[in-house]
Amino acid sequence: MAAVWREGDDLLLRLYIQPKASRDSIVGLHGEELKVAITAPPIDGKANAHLSKYLAKLCKVAKGSVVIEKGELGRHKQVRILQPSQIPAEITALIE
């Protein structure tokens, strides 16, 4: 299964999250998932909120347009970005 794919106008990402990183970044592929490092700790939903904000900024959409579909409580997540205005080059290269 692909790490990144389109479904209509939406972008879907299978992610592996690394919380408490030194900076926010898209690291690259981690098995069949896209590894994303974020600075927020995995406490009380802070990492999920920070991930949504980071992906919204990258794709130039509102935070509400980033939906965590699976993996709310784990490092492995599936995220849907509704009608992204922009897709970063690191993600575009992986779209199938």
Curated annotation (Swiss-Prot):
Pfam families associated with the record: DUF167
GO cellular component: cytoplasm
Transmembrane segments annotated in the record for this chain: none
InterPro entries, A to Z: DUF167, YggU-like_sf
Entry similarity comment: Belongs to the UPF0235 family.
Protein name: UPF0235 protein VC0395_A0010/VC395_0502
High-level lineage: Bacteria, Pseudomonadati, Pseudomonadota, Gammaproteobacteria, Vibrionales
